[in-house]
């Protein structure tokens, strides 16, 4: 996969939106575990008050954002880990967070990894999808996506009827402009989108 070109050369918000409907999976011992991306968020670097690199912050913890586009940036909060990918050229610390997937491959293993939690609870959030894939550490942080067991299949894209742009989730410490910036993208009506109310679920999960 030509991840370097995919994750550079255009606005990070556009890259983030283009990830919707792409297969995202983890290859574990020959087994494929994952599904279609249904929700993602863009973070726009040193001027984005919600970004880990805001103001030019650079540390061992967020170094992945500063690397070349297509580099994995895994960060942790408490016991949870989150999967991001650096966008833009090295030194321009922007990135996208994969927030949710609709599970397709390795469902039995996902159920085990999530302690039996099934249905939308399986992968309807960024920490949940990492748990479902069996990822518990930052071991693959800083690795090029192409050299890792994670795959985003750029040759396939499940078409969504509508992709919604909305404010990012949990951004309360930023100034209002950044807190309300429409940098979260999701498939309208897909039950695996984090926080999607049951009354808004579509029978076809929002796919064409």
Swiss-Prot record:
GO terms for molecular function: alkylbase DNA N-glycosylase activity; DNA binding. InterPro entries: Formyl_transferase-like_C_sf, MPG, MPG_sf. Disulfide bonds: none annotated. One of its GO terms (biological process) is base-excision repair. It holds the Pfam family Pur_DNA_glyco. Keywords: DNA damage, DNA repair, Hydrolase. Its EC number is 3.2.2.-. CDD domains: AAG. It comes from the Bacteria. Belongs to the DNA glycosylase MPG family. HAMAP family: 3MGH. This is Putative 3-methyladenine DNA glycosylase. The lineage of its organism: Bacteria, Bacillati, Bacillota, Bacilli, Lactobacillales.
């Amino acid at each position: 996969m030509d991840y370097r070109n995919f994750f550079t050369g255009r606005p990070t918000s556009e890259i983030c939106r283009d990830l919707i409907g792409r297969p995202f999976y983890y290859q574990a011992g020959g087994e494929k575990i994952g599904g279609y991306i249904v929700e993602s968020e863009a973070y726009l670097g040193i001027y984005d008050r919600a970004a880990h690199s805001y103001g030019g912050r650079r540390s061992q913890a967020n170094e992945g954002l500063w690397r070349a586009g297509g580099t994995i940036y895994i960060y942790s909060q408490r016991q949870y880990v989150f999967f991001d990918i650096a966008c833009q050229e090295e030194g321009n610390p922007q990135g996208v967070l994969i927030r949710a997937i609709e599970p397709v491959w390795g469902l039995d293993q996902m159920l085990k990894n999530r302690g039996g939690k099934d249905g939308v609870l399986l992968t309807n959030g960024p920490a949940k999808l990492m748990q479902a894939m069996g990822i518990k550490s930052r071991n693959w942080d800083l690795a090029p996506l192409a050299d890792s067991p994670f795959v985003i299949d750029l040759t396939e894209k499940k078409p969504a009827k509508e992709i919604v742009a909305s404010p990012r989730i949990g951004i309360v410490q930023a100034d209002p402009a950044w807190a309300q910036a429409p940098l979260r993208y999701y498939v309208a009506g897909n039950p695996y989108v984090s926080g999607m109310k049951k009354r808004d679920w579509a029978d076809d999960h929002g796919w064409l």
